[in-house]
């Protein structure tokens, strides 16, 4: 069964072909990053128009890569939401029109579910059940995943998502758009503990997270540096140090909350998905993760247990059509009914969890 996947929720146009017998056959992606850089952020109208221009050429490119034709497509999956309304509508219109013309089913996919399942595209795949950390510009959530369609939301950010905090902090530091990736790059040259920022909610008993206060702490540090130097410019090394301290704080919070989720569920496998999943520091920290079951005072400590951690291939951390094609194929196999034309710019993840 060959499924065409279409992703158009924000500023990447992704098209891919996934074969339920042979795996991923083709994957094409166009990013609008350069177009939006001039404006310092995504312009929804420009994003929508660019999706319209790119969808047909990308589809034909995928078919050529796979040595397939339109007639070989068995189903069309598309991102129904959440995302930018106009951008979603561009993908939905194309997917539904193509499916109608081919007389094939169309499968709506929740964008976050696509990210959630993207590590299953890797050669080394996790087994169910696992704890999933969805960490991107729009969402930071921890979930218990027991199978396709069997998800339980355990905790999430109560304010800014981690990726959003990266981007806003980068803008505060005067870094060019898109700033999150640049901040991570500069953090590599930062000195450890030159700055120390708070780890919001790291010791709370629940799995909720908060990053807006961390952003405020960075602003306070930046204003202090500028006042001491009597200039708006921040010395290069100081800026790098701030980037490192910020990144370390975010990763520490994410790691602490995921460890708590592992202890709560009893799972020993973690899947990290979403754009921030490409962050080197996060991958390094999670790659060395262990958990230790708490013991009563005076009792011998339990030995640390190694955790198996899985990341999607770097190409599938950001928005892409491959994850949508795969998620659509999985739902088609499990009997999900074909969907409708409508899009859902605001689609709470709670509506797809059990």
From Swiss-Prot:
It comes from the Bacteria. SUPFAM superfamilies: Actin-like ATPase domain. Keywords: Acyltransferase, Cytoplasm, Iron, Metal-binding, Transferase, tRNA processing. Its EC number is 2.3.1.234. Binds 1 Fe(2+) ion per subunit. Substrate binds at residues 134-138, 167, 180, 279. It catalyses: L-threonylcarbamoyladenylate + adenosine(37) in tRNA = N(6)-L-threonylcarbamoyladenosine(37) in tRNA + AMP + H(+). GO terms for cellular component: cytoplasm. It is an enzyme of class 2 (transferase). One of its GO terms (biological process) is tRNA threonylcarbamoyladenosine modification. Fe cation binds at residues 111, 115, 319. GO terms for molecular function: iron ion binding; N(6)-L-threonylcarbamoyladenine synthase activity. It is found in: Cytoplasm. Its cofactor is Fe(2+). Belongs to the KAE1 / TsaD family. Required for the formation of a threonylcarbamoyl group on adenosine at position 37 (t(6)A37) in tRNAs that read codons beginning with adenine. Is involved in the transfer of the threonylcarbamoyl moiety of threonylcarbamoyl-AMP (TC-AMP) to the N6 group of A37, together with TsaE and TsaB. TsaD likely plays a direct catalytic role in this reaction. PANTHER family: TRNA N6-ADENOSINE THREONYLCARBAMOYLTRANSFERASE, TRNA N6-ADENOSINE THREONYLCARBAMOYLTRANSFERASE, MITOCHONDRIAL. NCBIfam families: gcp_kae1 (TIGR00329), T6A_TsaD_YgjD (TIGR03723). This is tRNA N6-adenosine threonylcarbamoyltransferase. It comes from Neisseria meningitidis serogroup C / serotype 2a (strain ATCC 700532 / DSM 15464 / FAM18).
């Amino acid at each position: 069964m060959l499924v065409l996947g279409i992703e158009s929720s924000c500023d990447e146009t992704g098209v891919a072909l996934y074969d339920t017998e042979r795996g991923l056959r083709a994957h094409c992606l166009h990013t609008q990053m350069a177009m939006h850089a001039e404006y310092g952020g995504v312009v929804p109208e420009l994003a929508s128009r660019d999706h319209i221009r790119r969808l047909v050429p990308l589809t034909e490119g995928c078919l050529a890569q796979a040595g397939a034709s339109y007639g070989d497509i068995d189903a069309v999956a598309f991102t129904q939401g959440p995302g930018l309304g106009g951008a979603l509508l561009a993908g939905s219109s194309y997917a539904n029109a193509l499916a109608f013309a081919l007389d094939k089913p169309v499968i709506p996919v929740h964008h976050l579910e696509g990210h959630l399942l993207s590590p299953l595209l890797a050669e080394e795949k996790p087994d169910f059940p696992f704890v999933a950390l969805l960490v991107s510009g729009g969402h930071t959530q921890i979930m218990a995943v027991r199978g396709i369609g069997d998800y339980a939301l355990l905790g999430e950010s109560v304010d800014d998502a981690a990726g959003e905090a990266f981007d806003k902090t980068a803008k505060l530091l005067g870094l060019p758009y898109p700033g999150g990736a640049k901040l991570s790059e500069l953090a590599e040259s930062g000195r450890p503990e030159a700055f120390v920022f708070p780890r919001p909610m790291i010791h709370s008993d629940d799995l909720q997270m908060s990053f807006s206060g961390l952003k405020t702490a960075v602003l306070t540090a930046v204003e202090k540096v500028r006042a001491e130097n009597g200039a708006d410019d921040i010395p290069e090394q100081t800026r790098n140090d701030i980037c490192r301290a910020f990144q370390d704080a975010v990763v520490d919070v994410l790691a602490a909350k995921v460890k708590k989720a592992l202890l709560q569920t009893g799972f020993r496998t973690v899947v990290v998905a979403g754009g921030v999943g490409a962050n080197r520091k996060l991958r390094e920290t999670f790659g060395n993760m262990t958990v230790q079951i708490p013991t009563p005072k005076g009792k011998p400590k339990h030995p640390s247990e190694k955790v198996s951690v899985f990341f999607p291939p770097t190409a599938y951390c950001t928005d892409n059509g491959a994850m949508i094609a795969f998620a659509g194929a999985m739902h088609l196999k499990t009997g999900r009914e074909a969907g409708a034309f409508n899009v859902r710019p605001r689609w709470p993840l709670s509506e797809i969890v059990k």
